[in-house]
Amino acid sequence: MSVLPPTLRENRRYVLFRIITLVNPTQKEVYRSMADSVSALFGDAGAAKMHPAVVWSEGEYAIARCTRGYEQSLIAALAVVTKVCGEPASFRSLATSGTILSLKKKVIPESIDDTTYPGYLCAGKKVNNLSKENGHRYLTRDDIIKE
């Protein structure tokens, strides 16, 4: 069987999302949670049209794939995930793109005290409205959640 030329292949879109949970789930566990959510929200026929898959997962970030035109449906399904591995969790979509590489470039690791933390690049967005600086800012989980 020969390979289809690029013009005949199905177009896909990729969604970068953040996994907010206390456990560190594997890519397969993230996929199971996403697939359950897609099936519950859109049924088996909707899931078959969408072709959801998790193609990359590292730390608290992951990239999901779907058929072009179903990006908003996938984002809605990601938003209703409540558990991963039986633990409370939520998925927050960050960006959508046509290539995996462009989404991976948005996840930049940052080292603080010889410890590497994943970070999300917010290029072109105003982070600090008081001083109107658009420089890159990196926040870790410890910066956001202060006990």
From Swiss-Prot:
Pfam families: RNase_P_Rpp14. Keywords: Cytoplasm, Endonuclease, Hydrolase, Nuclease, tRNA processing. It is found in: Cytoplasm. InterPro entries: Pop5/Rpp14/Rnp2-like, Rnp2-like_sf. GO terms for molecular function: ribonuclease P activity. Its main location: cytoplasm. It catalyses: Endonucleolytic cleavage of RNA, removing 5'-extranucleotides from tRNA precursor. Its EC number is 3.1.26.5. One of its GO terms (biological process) is tRNA 5'-leader removal. It comes from the Archaea. One of its GO terms (cellular component) is ribonuclease P complex. The keyword Ribosomal protein does not apply. Part of ribonuclease P, a protein complex that generates mature tRNA molecules by cleaving their 5'-ends. Belongs to the eukaryotic/archaeal RNase P protein component 2 family. Consists of a catalytic RNA component and at least 4-5 protein subunits. This is Ribonuclease P protein component 2. It comes from Methanocorpusculum labreanum (strain ATCC 43576 / DSM 4855 / Z). The gene is rnp2.
